[in-house]
C-alpha cells in the first residue's frame, strides 16, 4: 500500500476494475428486491457544471447504498439531446446540430465516468437518435387516432423577420430575442395533447405520492388549478348587439353576482370583434392587446388597460344593463374569454374600475366593513355575509352560492361547473432540431398518421439552420411524400415536437432500451417501474414532472405499464452557489469577474473584508453568494477540481457541505478540508496495514477502554444508517465518520486486541464511506484483506450489545449549575442514583446550610438538586 494518498492512480484503477467487470450492468432478477434510482438526464451542453456533479453524486450515493443493502439496483444515464441550444450553437458556429450534440455527448460522458458513477451505460439513451424517437412517433400516432392528440389553431408569438414562433421567454419587451423585430400574435395550426382529460386524476393521484416534497405537490395542484364555480350567462342587450344570445362567464364567486357592474372580454372575443367594426380606436387597442404576451404571469403583472364598447349585456337576475369593455387582463384561453367584473371584491376589477371611473358596489360584509374605499385591501376579497343583494342579503358564502345557483338554473342562465387552470399541451414547434411529427397532410384524406411500418420519420442530420424559419419547411426532399391512405401526392408535417415530450417517457425506455418490438418491453417495464427514487432540480416541479406523470397515465392506458405514477420518491436537490465579484462600469453596467482572478483580504475571523483583481491590484465589489452561472462568471469547472483533488474529494465535499435538498455554498477551503480528511483515512489505514494482518477480535476480552472505542464504531454505524437510509442527510452521515476517525486516530495500537479493534474500525469507515467516496473505499477494502470488492460487501449492521454501557457518567447540578460528575452502573435505579448524588462531596459543599427541596433525575444524563 503506497504511503501517500494518490487519488489519480486509485480512481483510475477502480474505474478500470468496474468497467472490466461490468459491475453496474444489471438484468431483471425475479425474486430479488429491485431499486431503480434515476437522476434527471442532462442536456449535452458541452461541459458538466457543478449542478450536474451534485445531482449525479446524490443519485450515485443512494444507488450504491441500496446495492449494499443487497438490492438489484438500476441506475441508468442518457441524453436529453434535442432542443434550441443546439440550433443556436449551429447558427453561431456554422455546424450541424447533430455533430455539435454528438461531440458534446462524447466529452460529457467521459466527464461523468471520471466521477465514478455506478451507472449501467449499456442502457444509455440519446433522444435525438431515430431508435429512440421512433417510439415517440409510434405513440403519437396511437394517441392521434384515439383523439388524445388533436390539431387546432393556437395563438403564438410570431417573429416576422426570422419567420418563426417564439416561446414567451424569447420575447423581450415585445421584440424577438434574436432579430429584435416587433412580435406579432398569430393563429397557426398546432398539435395538442389533451392533458385536461386527465386533470382530475393528475390532481387526485398526488395524494398517492407521500415520498414527494409537499412544496412540489402544492405547485402542481396550483398549476392544475381546479376551481368549483358557476357558469353564468348574461343575455345580450339586443338593441346594442343586434342579435339574441348570451355572454358566458365562469366565476368562483357567484355570491358576488349582485355586485357586478360591468363585463370585460378578451381582445380575441367575438363581441370585441363586433364592437370594433367602424371603431378604429377600439381596433387599434385590440391589435395592441394581441401583440402582448400570451403568458399568464405577464398578464397578471402588466398595467390593466381597457376600452369601452357601445355594447351592453343584461344582468341575469336584475335585468340591469351592464357595459361591455375590452380589457387586456382577460385571457381568451382561460374560461370563456370573458369575466363578470365585481370591483368591490376582486383586486384586478377594483384597479380597473378605479382607473376608468366605473361603479364599485360592495355586496359582502368583510372584516374591513361594508364599504370598500381605495386603496384595495386584501380583506375586500374575503367571504362573508351578503349585503346590498336583494333577496340574498344576509346569506353566507355557501348559502348564497346555492341560492344564486338555484335562481340562475330556474331561468336557464347558469349552472355549477368545475374548471381547471390547466390548458391542453401544445407541442408543435417550428424548429428543426426536434422529433418530427408523424403526420401527412393530404388534400383528400386530411391529416393522416404515418403507418407503423413507415416509422420512424427520420430527421435529416446534415442540416445547418440559419435561424430564419423552419429548415424542414424549405426542404422538399423531406416534406414531399405520398398519402399513406390514398397514395396521392401529399405533404409531410414540418413542425417538430416540444422537447418536453422526449423527457416525459425516457425513464420507461431505460427498462428495455434496445427492445425493437415496442416502446417498452412490458415485463422489463413492470419489473423496474415505477422509479423508486427520482432526483432533480425544483425548477422542474411543474412542467417536466407534470408531463411525465401525464405520459405515464397515457402509457398505462395503452397497456404498456401497470403502475399509475412514474416516480415513487422525489428528491429536489438544492442549487450550488458561489461568491460573485464585479466592477461597476461608468455606464452603470456590471462587469462580472471570475473568483479565481480575485485576491481576498480576510480579518482574524476569516471574514472577507476586501477584494482585488489579482492582475491589476485594484478593488472589485463583492456581489454576494449566487447560483453558479456563466453570466455571473462564478462557476467552478468540475474537471479542474477532479484533476486537482480527485473525484472522491469532490463527491465528499458535495455530500458534506449541505443536506441534499438545501443550497450548497462552494468553498475552496471546504474542498481542501475534504481532501485532508481522505488523506487522514489513507494514512491511518496505511500505517495499520504496514504492521501486517491482525488477529480476530475477542469481544468477551475487551477492556473498558476498548469497549468505549467499539461503542463509537457501532454508534457511527447506527447513526449513519439512519442518516443515509431514512433521512437522506448525507452530510450528517459524513460527520459521523469524521467523529469515528477522531476516536480511531487516538486509539492505542499496542496489543493484538487493539489492532483487531482498529481493523474493525477501519473496515467500518471504509464501508460507511463506500457510497460517497467509492474509489478510495475500493482500494482500502482490498488492502484491509478482503477478496470481494467493496461494492459487493454488505452495508454494516450495528451490534446492539456494543452500544450497551456497563457504567454511565452523569452530570450533577445544584440549582441548575454544574457541580461535578458521578460514575454509576448503567443498571442503577433512580433511588441509587439520587443517593449517590446526595453524598457527592461537591453536592455536600454547595448545599451546606441549605435544605434540599427536590432531586430531579434525568435517566442516563444528569441529576439536578434543588436546594434553598
UniProtKB/Swiss-Prot annotation:
GO terms for molecular function: aminoacyl-tRNA deacylase activity; ATP binding; leucine-tRNA ligase activity. Keywords: Aminoacyl-tRNA synthetase, ATP-binding, Cytoplasm, Ligase, Nucleotide-binding, Protein biosynthesis. A motif ('KMSKS' region) lies at residues 627-631. It catalyses: tRNA(Leu) + L-leucine + ATP = L-leucyl-tRNA(Leu) + AMP + diphosphate. Gene3D superfamilies: 2.20.28.290, 3.10.20.590, HUPs, Isoleucyl-tRNA Synthetase, Domain 1. It holds the Pfam family tRNA-synt_1g. ATP binds at residue 630. Its EC number is 6.1.1.4. Its main location: cytoplasm. GO terms for biological process: leucyl-tRNA aminoacylation. A motif ('HIGH' region) lies at residues 42-52. It is found in: Cytoplasm. It comes from the Bacteria. GO terms for cellular component: cytosol. Belongs to the class-I aminoacyl-tRNA synthetase family. This is Leucine--tRNA ligase.
Amino acid at each position: 500500500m503506497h504511503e501517500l494518498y494518490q487519488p489519480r492512480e486509485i480512481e483510475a484503477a477502480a474505474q478500470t476494475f468496474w468497467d472490466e467487470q461490468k459491475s453496474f450492468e444489471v438484468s431483471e432478477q425475479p425474486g430479488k428486491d429491485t431499486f431503480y434510482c434515476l437522476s434527471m438526464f442532462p442536456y449535452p451542453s458541452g461541459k458538466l457544471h457543478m449542478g450536474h456533479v451534485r445531482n449525479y453524486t446524490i443519485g450515485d450515493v443512494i444507488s450504491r447504498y441500496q446495492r449494499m443493502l443487497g438490492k438489484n439496483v438500476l441506475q441508468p444515464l442518457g441524453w436529453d439531446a434535442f432542443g434550441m441550444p443546439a440550433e443556436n450553437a449551429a447558427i453561431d458556429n456554422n455546424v450541424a446540430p447533430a455533430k455539435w450534440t454528438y461531440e458534446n455527448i462524447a466529452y460529457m460522458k467521459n466527464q461523468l465516468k471520471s466521477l465514478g458513477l455506478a451507472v449501467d451505460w449499456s442502457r444509455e439513451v440519446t433522444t435525438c437518435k431515430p431508435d429512440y424517437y421512433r417510439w415517440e412517433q409510434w405513440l403519437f400516432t396511437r394517441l392521434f387516432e384515439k383523439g388524445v392528440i388533436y390539431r387546432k389553431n393556437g395563438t403564438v408569438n410570431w417573429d416576422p423577420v426570422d419567420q418563426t414562433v417564439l416561446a414567451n421567454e424569447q420575447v423581450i419587451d415585445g421584440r424577438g430575442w434574436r432579430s429584435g423585430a416587433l412580435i406579432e400574435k398569430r393563429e397557426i395550426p398546432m398539435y395538442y395533447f389533451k392533458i385536461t382529460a386527465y386533470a382530475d386524476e393528475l390532481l387526485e393521484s398526488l395524494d398517492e405520492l407521500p415520498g414527494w416534497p409537499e412544496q412540489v405537490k402544492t405547485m402542481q395542484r396550483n398549476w392544475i388549478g381546479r376551481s368549483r364555480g358557476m357558469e353564468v350567462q348574461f343575455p345580450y342587450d339586443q338593441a346594442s348587439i343586434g342579435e339574441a344570445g348570451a355572454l358566458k362567464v365562469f366565476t368562483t364567486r357567484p355570491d358576488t353576482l349582485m355586485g357586478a357592474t360591468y363585463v370585460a372580454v378578451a381582445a380575441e372575443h367575438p363581441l370585441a370583434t363586433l364592437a370594433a367594426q367602424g371603431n378604429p380606436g377600439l381596433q387599434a387597442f385590440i391589435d395592441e392587446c394581441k401583440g402582448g404576451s400570451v403568458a399568464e404571469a405577464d398578464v397578471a403583472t402588466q398595467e390593466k388597460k381597457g376600452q369601452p364598447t357601445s355594447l351592453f349585456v343584461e344582468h341575469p337576475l336584475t335585468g340591469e344593463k351592464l357595459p361591455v369593455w375590452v380589457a387586456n387582463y382577460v385571457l381568451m384561453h382561460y374560461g370563456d374569454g370573458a369575466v363578470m367584473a365585481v370591483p368591490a371584491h376582486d383586486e384586478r376589477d377594483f384597479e380597473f374600475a378605479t382607473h376608468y371611473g366605473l361603479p364599485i358596489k360592495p355586496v359582502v360584509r368583510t372584516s374591513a366593513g361594508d364599504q370598500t374605499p381605495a386603496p384595495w385591501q386584501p380583506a375586500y376579497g374575503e367571504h362573508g355575509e351578503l349585503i346590498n343583494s336583494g333577496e340574498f342579503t344576509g346569506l353566507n358564502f355557501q348559502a348564497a352560492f346555492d341560492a344564486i345557483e338555484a335562481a340562475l338554473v330556474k331561468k336557464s342562465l347558469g349552472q355549477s361547473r368545475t374548471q381547471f387552470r390547466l390548458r391542453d399541451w401544445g407541442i408543435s414547434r417550428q424548429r428543426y432540431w426536434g422529433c418530427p411529427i408523424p403526420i401527412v397532410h393530404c388534400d383528400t384524406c386530411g391529416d393522416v398518421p404515418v403507418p407503423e411500418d413507415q416509422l420512424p420519420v427520420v430527421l435529416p442530420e446534415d442540416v445547418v439552420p440559419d435561424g430564419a424559419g423552419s429548415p424542414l419547411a424549405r426542404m422538399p426532399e423531406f416534406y414531399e411524400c405520398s398519402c399513406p391512405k390514398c397514395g396521392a401526392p401529399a405533404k409531410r408535417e414540418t413542425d417538430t415536437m416540444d422537447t418536453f415530450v422526449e423527457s416525459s417517457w425516457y425513464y420507461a425506455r431505460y427498462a428495455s432500451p434496445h427492445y425493437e418490438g415496442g416502446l417498452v418491453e412490458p415485463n422489463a417495464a413492470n419489473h423496474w417501474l415505477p422509479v423508486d427514487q427520482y432526483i432533480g432540480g425544483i425548477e422542474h416541479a411543474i412542467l417536466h414532472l407534470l408531463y411525465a406523470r401525464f405520459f405515464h397515465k397515457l402509457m398505462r392506458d395503452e397497456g404498456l405499464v401497470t403502475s399509475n405514477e412514474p416516480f415513487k420518491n422525489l428528491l429536489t436537490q438544492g442549487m450550488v452557489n458561489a461568491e460573485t465579484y464585479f466592477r461597476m462600469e461608468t455606464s452603470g453596467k456590471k462587469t462580472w469577474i471570475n473568483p479565481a482572478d480575485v485576491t481576498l483580504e480576510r480579518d482574524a475571523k476569516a471574514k472577507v473584508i476586501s477584494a482585488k483583481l489579482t492582475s491589476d491590484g485594484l478593488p472589485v465589489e463583492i456581489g454576494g453568494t449566487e447560483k453558479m452561472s456563466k453570466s455571473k462568471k462564478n462557476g467552478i469547472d468540475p474537471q479542474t477540481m477532479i484533476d486537482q483533488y480527485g473525484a472522491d474529494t469532490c463527491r465528499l465535499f458535495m455530500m458534506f457541505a449541505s443536506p441534499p435538498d438545501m443550497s450548497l455554498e462552494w468553498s475552496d477551503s471546504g474542498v481542501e478540508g475534504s481532501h485532508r480528511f481522505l488523506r487522514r483515512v489513507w494514512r491511518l489505514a496505511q500505517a495499520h496495514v504496514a504492521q501486517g494482518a491482525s488477529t480476530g477480535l475477542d469481544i468477551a476480552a475487551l477492556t473498558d477502554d476498548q469497549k468505549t472505542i467499539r461503542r463509537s464504531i457501532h454508534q457511527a454505524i447506527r447513526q449513519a444508517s439512519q442518516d443515509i437510509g431514512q433521512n437522506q442527510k448525507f452530510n450528517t452521515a459524513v460527520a459521523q465518520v469524521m467523529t469515528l476517525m477522531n476516536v480511531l486516530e487516538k486509539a492505542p495500537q499496542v496489543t493484538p486486541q487493539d489492532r483487531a479493534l482498529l481493523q474493525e474500525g477501519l473496515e467500518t469507515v471504509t464501508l460507511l464511506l463506500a457510497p460517497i467516496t467509492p474509489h478510495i473505499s475500493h482500494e482500502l477494502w482490498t488492502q484491509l484483506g478482503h477478496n470481494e470488492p467493496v461494492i459487493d460487501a454488505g452495508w454494516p449492521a450495528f451490534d446492539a450489545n456494543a452500544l450497551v454501557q456497563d457504567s454511565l457518567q452523569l452530570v450533577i447540578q445544584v440549582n441548575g449549575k454544574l457541580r461535578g460528575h458521578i460514575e454509576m452502573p448503567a443498571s442503577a435505579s433512580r433511588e441509587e442514583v439520587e443517593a449517590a448524588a446526595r453524598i457527592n462531596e461537591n453536592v455536600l459543599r454547595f448545599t451546606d446550610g441549605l435544605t434540599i427541596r427536590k432531586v430531579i433525575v434525568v435517566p442516563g444524563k444528569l441529576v439536578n438538586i434543588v436546594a434553598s
